[in-house]
Amino acid sequence: MPLMSSSFTPGQAQATVNSFQDKGQRQIAQAELYYFSARAEECKDIAELYLQDKDIYLRLSAGLLYSFSNLTLGNPSAAKMGFRNIQECLHQTEQNPPSNEAMASCVFANYLAMVLMHLPTDKLPPLRDFLPYLPTGLRAYGIYVLAHNAYLHEEYANALGLCQSVFLMLDGCYPIAMEYLYCVIIMSLVNQKKENEARDVLMTAWNMAKADGFLEPFIEHHGLMLGQIEACIKPTEPELYKQLSQAVIAFSRGWMNIHNPKLQASVTDKLTPMEFAIAML
Protein backbone atom coordinates (compact mmCIF):
# COMPACT_ATOMS: atom_id res chain seq x y z
CA MET A 1 0.00 0.00 0.00
CA PRO A 2 2.45 2.67 -1.18
CA LEU A 3 0.07 5.63 -0.83
CA MET A 4 -1.01 4.62 2.67
CA SER A 5 2.67 4.32 3.57
CA SER A 6 3.42 7.84 2.31
CA SER A 7 3.56 11.08 4.22
CA PHE A 8 2.00 13.98 2.32
CA THR A 9 0.10 17.21 2.87
CA PRO A 10 -3.69 16.82 2.62
CA GLY A 11 -4.70 17.74 -0.91
CA GLN A 12 -1.52 16.29 -2.41
CA ALA A 13 -2.59 12.66 -2.81
CA GLN A 14 -2.59 12.69 -6.62
CA ALA A 15 0.77 14.46 -6.74
CA THR A 16 2.14 11.81 -4.37
CA VAL A 17 0.84 9.04 -6.63
CA ASN A 18 2.47 10.68 -9.65
CA SER A 19 5.81 10.88 -7.84
CA PHE A 20 6.34 7.11 -7.68
CA GLN A 21 9.02 6.11 -10.19
CA ASP A 22 8.19 2.39 -10.20
CA LYS A 23 5.24 1.65 -12.49
CA GLY A 24 3.76 -1.06 -10.26
CA GLN A 25 3.90 1.10 -7.14
CA ARG A 26 2.47 4.06 -9.04
CA GLN A 27 -0.46 2.04 -10.37
CA ILE A 28 -1.25 0.46 -7.00
CA ALA A 29 -1.02 3.91 -5.38
CA GLN A 30 -3.50 5.16 -8.00
CA ALA A 31 -5.81 2.26 -7.14
CA GLU A 32 -5.55 3.27 -3.47
CA LEU A 33 -6.47 6.83 -4.33
CA TYR A 34 -9.50 5.57 -6.24
CA TYR A 35 -10.53 3.28 -3.39
CA PHE A 36 -10.28 5.87 -0.63
CA SER A 37 -12.10 8.34 -2.90
CA ALA A 38 -15.02 5.87 -3.18
CA ARG A 39 -14.31 5.10 -6.84
CA ALA A 40 -14.51 1.33 -6.49
CA GLU A 41 -14.82 0.40 -10.18
CA GLU A 42 -11.64 2.23 -11.15
CA CYS A 43 -9.82 0.77 -8.16
CA LYS A 44 -10.90 -2.76 -9.02
CA ASP A 45 -9.77 -2.47 -12.63
CA ILE A 46 -6.20 -1.62 -11.62
CA ALA A 47 -5.96 -3.99 -8.65
CA GLU A 48 -7.04 -6.95 -10.79
CA LEU A 49 -3.89 -6.57 -12.89
CA TYR A 50 -1.65 -7.28 -9.88
CA LEU A 51 -3.43 -10.15 -8.13
CA GLN A 52 -0.76 -12.63 -9.25
CA ASP A 53 2.21 -10.27 -9.35
CA LYS A 54 5.60 -11.70 -8.39
CA ASP A 55 6.18 -8.76 -6.05
CA ILE A 56 4.49 -9.87 -2.83
CA TYR A 57 3.92 -6.29 -1.67
CA LEU A 58 2.05 -5.40 -4.86
CA ARG A 59 0.14 -8.68 -4.71
CA LEU A 60 -0.98 -8.09 -1.12
CA SER A 61 -2.01 -4.52 -1.88
CA ALA A 62 -3.92 -5.67 -4.94
CA GLY A 63 -5.69 -8.38 -2.95
CA LEU A 64 -6.91 -5.92 -0.32
CA LEU A 65 -8.00 -3.29 -2.83
CA TYR A 66 -9.67 -5.83 -5.11
CA SER A 67 -11.57 -7.43 -2.23
CA PHE A 68 -12.89 -4.28 -0.62
CA SER A 69 -13.74 -2.55 -3.90
CA ASN A 70 -15.74 -5.61 -4.93
CA LEU A 71 -17.71 -5.41 -1.68
CA THR A 72 -18.98 -2.01 -2.76
CA LEU A 73 -19.62 -3.24 -6.29
CA GLY A 74 -21.74 -6.13 -5.03
CA ASN A 75 -19.40 -8.90 -6.20
CA PRO A 76 -18.98 -11.16 -3.13
CA SER A 77 -17.37 -14.02 -5.06
CA ALA A 78 -14.69 -11.67 -6.42
CA ALA A 79 -14.16 -10.21 -2.94
CA LYS A 80 -13.68 -13.71 -1.53
CA MET A 81 -11.17 -14.51 -4.25
CA GLY A 82 -9.13 -11.47 -3.25
CA PHE A 83 -9.22 -12.51 0.40
CA ARG A 84 -8.07 -16.03 -0.54
CA ASN A 85 -5.19 -14.50 -2.46
CA ILE A 86 -4.09 -12.67 0.69
CA GLN A 87 -4.31 -15.87 2.74
CA GLU A 88 -2.21 -17.74 0.18
CA CYS A 89 0.50 -15.08 0.44
CA LEU A 90 0.66 -15.61 4.21
CA HIS A 91 0.80 -19.41 3.91
CA GLN A 92 3.59 -19.25 1.33
CA THR A 93 5.56 -16.74 3.35
CA GLU A 94 5.20 -18.74 6.58
CA GLN A 95 6.76 -21.75 4.86
CA ASN A 96 9.70 -19.80 3.49
CA PRO A 97 9.81 -16.23 4.83
CA PRO A 98 12.01 -14.04 2.58
CA SER A 99 12.28 -11.28 5.21
CA ASN A 100 10.72 -9.95 8.39
CA GLU A 101 9.26 -7.11 6.35
CA ALA A 102 7.51 -9.47 3.92
CA MET A 103 6.12 -11.55 6.77
CA ALA A 104 4.93 -8.39 8.53
CA SER A 105 3.11 -7.24 5.40
CA CYS A 106 1.39 -10.62 5.05
CA VAL A 107 0.25 -10.61 8.67
CA PHE A 108 -0.89 -6.98 8.36
CA ALA A 109 -2.99 -7.69 5.25
CA ASN A 110 -4.65 -10.78 6.73
CA TYR A 111 -5.32 -9.12 10.09
CA LEU A 112 -6.79 -6.10 8.33
CA ALA A 113 -9.12 -8.23 6.23
CA MET A 114 -10.37 -10.22 9.22
CA VAL A 115 -10.88 -7.28 11.58
CA LEU A 116 -12.67 -5.07 9.06
CA MET A 117 -14.99 -7.97 8.26
CA HIS A 118 -15.53 -8.45 12.03
CA LEU A 119 -14.17 -12.00 11.86
CA PRO A 120 -11.94 -13.75 14.45
CA THR A 121 -8.17 -13.31 14.27
CA ASP A 122 -7.14 -16.03 16.73
CA LYS A 123 -5.63 -18.22 13.99
CA LEU A 124 -3.34 -15.46 12.74
CA PRO A 125 0.13 -14.57 14.04
CA PRO A 126 -0.12 -11.59 16.43
CA LEU A 127 0.05 -8.35 14.48
CA ARG A 128 1.68 -6.53 17.40
CA ASP A 129 4.83 -8.62 16.98
CA PHE A 130 5.27 -7.45 13.40
CA LEU A 131 4.50 -3.73 13.70
CA PRO A 132 8.20 -2.74 13.99
CA TYR A 133 8.85 -4.19 10.52
CA LEU A 134 6.20 -2.06 8.80
CA PRO A 135 6.86 1.40 7.33
CA THR A 136 5.51 4.26 9.43
CA GLY A 137 2.25 4.80 7.55
CA LEU A 138 1.38 1.10 7.56
CA ARG A 139 2.41 0.81 11.22
CA ALA A 140 0.01 3.63 12.08
CA TYR A 141 -2.74 1.90 10.13
CA GLY A 142 -1.83 -1.39 11.79
CA ILE A 143 -2.44 0.21 15.17
CA TYR A 144 -5.79 1.44 13.84
CA VAL A 145 -6.62 -2.21 13.05
CA LEU A 146 -5.67 -3.25 16.60
CA ALA A 147 -7.76 -0.38 18.00
CA HIS A 148 -10.70 -1.33 15.81
CA ASN A 149 -10.44 -4.88 17.12
CA ALA A 150 -10.37 -3.58 20.70
CA TYR A 151 -13.47 -1.51 19.94
CA LEU A 152 -15.28 -4.59 18.63
CA HIS A 153 -14.54 -6.25 21.98
CA GLU A 154 -16.05 -3.18 23.74
CA GLU A 155 -12.64 -2.09 25.06
CA TYR A 156 -13.35 1.55 24.29
CA ALA A 157 -10.71 3.10 26.55
CA ASN A 158 -8.05 0.79 25.13
CA ALA A 159 -9.11 1.57 21.56
CA LEU A 160 -9.02 5.30 22.27
CA GLY A 161 -5.61 5.11 23.93
CA LEU A 162 -4.09 3.11 21.09
CA CYS A 163 -5.24 5.65 18.51
CA GLN A 164 -4.18 8.68 20.49
CA SER A 165 -0.73 7.19 21.08
CA VAL A 166 -0.08 7.00 17.34
CA PHE A 167 -0.31 10.76 16.94
CA LEU A 168 2.51 11.13 19.47
CA MET A 169 4.90 8.97 17.46
CA LEU A 170 4.16 10.03 13.88
CA ASP A 171 7.04 11.83 12.18
CA GLY A 172 4.86 13.46 9.54
CA CYS A 173 1.34 13.64 8.12
CA TYR A 174 -0.05 10.30 6.94
CA PRO A 175 -3.59 11.28 5.93
CA ILE A 176 -5.02 7.83 5.16
CA ALA A 177 -3.91 6.21 8.41
CA MET A 178 -4.81 9.32 10.41
CA GLU A 179 -8.35 9.47 9.03
CA TYR A 180 -8.98 5.85 10.00
CA LEU A 181 -7.50 6.45 13.45
CA TYR A 182 -9.80 9.45 13.85
CA CYS A 183 -12.77 7.20 13.02
CA VAL A 184 -12.00 4.84 15.92
CA ILE A 185 -11.41 7.81 18.22
CA ILE A 186 -14.88 9.11 17.30
CA MET A 187 -16.47 5.69 17.81
CA SER A 188 -14.79 5.27 21.20
CA LEU A 189 -15.70 8.75 22.43
CA VAL A 190 -19.35 8.26 21.47
CA ASN A 191 -19.47 5.02 23.43
CA GLN A 192 -17.96 6.87 26.41
CA LYS A 193 -20.78 9.45 26.14
CA LYS A 194 -18.37 12.19 25.03
CA GLU A 195 -20.33 13.36 22.01
CA ASN A 196 -19.02 16.93 21.88
CA GLU A 197 -15.43 15.68 21.77
CA ALA A 198 -16.40 13.11 19.16
CA ARG A 199 -17.94 15.78 16.93
CA ASP A 200 -14.85 17.98 17.20
CA VAL A 201 -12.69 15.05 16.07
CA LEU A 202 -15.14 14.23 13.29
CA MET A 203 -14.87 17.72 11.84
CA THR A 204 -11.06 17.56 12.02
CA ALA A 205 -11.08 14.25 10.17
CA TRP A 206 -13.71 15.38 7.67
CA ASN A 207 -11.84 18.56 6.74
CA MET A 208 -8.62 16.61 6.26
CA ALA A 209 -10.34 13.97 4.14
CA LYS A 210 -12.17 16.48 1.92
CA ALA A 211 -8.87 17.85 0.65
CA ASP A 212 -8.33 14.63 -1.32
CA GLY A 213 -11.93 13.47 -1.61
CA PHE A 214 -11.31 10.58 0.79
CA LEU A 215 -14.88 9.57 1.69
CA GLU A 216 -14.16 5.87 2.20
CA PRO A 217 -13.19 5.99 5.92
CA PHE A 218 -16.58 7.54 6.72
CA ILE A 219 -18.40 5.07 4.49
CA GLU A 220 -16.84 2.09 6.26
CA HIS A 221 -17.41 3.44 9.78
CA HIS A 222 -20.74 5.17 9.24
CA GLY A 223 -22.86 2.81 11.35
CA LEU A 224 -20.27 2.60 14.14
CA MET A 225 -20.27 6.39 14.51
CA LEU A 226 -23.84 6.14 15.79
CA GLY A 227 -25.39 9.12 14.04
CA GLN A 228 -22.52 11.60 14.30
CA ILE A 229 -22.26 12.02 10.52
CA GLU A 230 -25.98 12.80 10.38
CA ALA A 231 -25.55 15.35 13.17
CA CYS A 232 -22.46 17.09 11.78
CA ILE A 233 -22.27 16.61 8.02
CA LYS A 234 -25.83 16.27 6.74
CA PRO A 235 -27.01 19.78 7.79
CA THR A 236 -23.97 21.63 6.42
CA GLU A 237 -23.00 19.61 3.33
CA PRO A 238 -26.15 17.89 2.04
CA GLU A 239 -24.74 17.04 -1.40
CA LEU A 240 -21.65 15.35 0.00
CA TYR A 241 -23.84 13.60 2.55
CA LYS A 242 -26.05 12.29 -0.26
CA GLN A 243 -22.99 10.93 -2.07
CA LEU A 244 -21.76 9.38 1.16
CA SER A 245 -25.15 7.80 1.88
CA GLN A 246 -25.35 6.11 -1.50
CA ALA A 247 -21.89 4.62 -1.00
CA VAL A 248 -22.77 3.48 2.53
CA ILE A 249 -25.71 1.47 1.21
CA ALA A 250 -23.57 -0.25 -1.44
CA PHE A 251 -20.70 -1.02 0.93
CA SER A 252 -22.97 -2.25 3.72
CA ARG A 253 -24.81 -4.68 1.46
CA GLY A 254 -21.54 -6.05 0.11
CA TRP A 255 -20.11 -6.33 3.62
CA MET A 256 -23.13 -8.30 4.82
CA ASN A 257 -22.88 -10.67 1.85
CA ILE A 258 -19.47 -11.75 3.15
CA HIS A 259 -19.98 -11.42 6.89
CA ASN A 260 -23.46 -12.86 7.13
CA PRO A 261 -24.10 -15.04 4.06
CA LYS A 262 -27.04 -16.88 5.64
CA LEU A 263 -28.96 -13.63 6.21
CA GLN A 264 -29.13 -12.17 2.72
CA ALA A 265 -32.35 -10.27 3.51
CA SER A 266 -31.37 -8.99 6.94
CA VAL A 267 -33.26 -6.04 8.42
CA THR A 268 -30.29 -3.67 8.27
CA ASP A 269 -29.94 -4.35 4.55
CA LYS A 270 -33.27 -2.60 4.00
CA LEU A 271 -32.56 0.53 6.07
CA THR A 272 -31.33 3.86 4.77
CA PRO A 273 -28.05 5.12 6.31
CA MET A 274 -29.97 7.53 8.56
CA GLU A 275 -32.43 4.84 9.68
CA PHE A 276 -29.54 2.51 10.40
CA ALA A 277 -27.73 5.19 12.42
CA ILE A 278 -30.89 5.81 14.48
CA ALA A 279 -31.35 2.08 15.04
CA MET A 280 -27.78 1.85 16.35
CA LEU A 281 -28.34 4.54 19.00
What are these regions (language model features)?
Residues 65, 75-78, 146-223:
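DNA-contacting interfaces and partner/effector-binding or oligomerization modules
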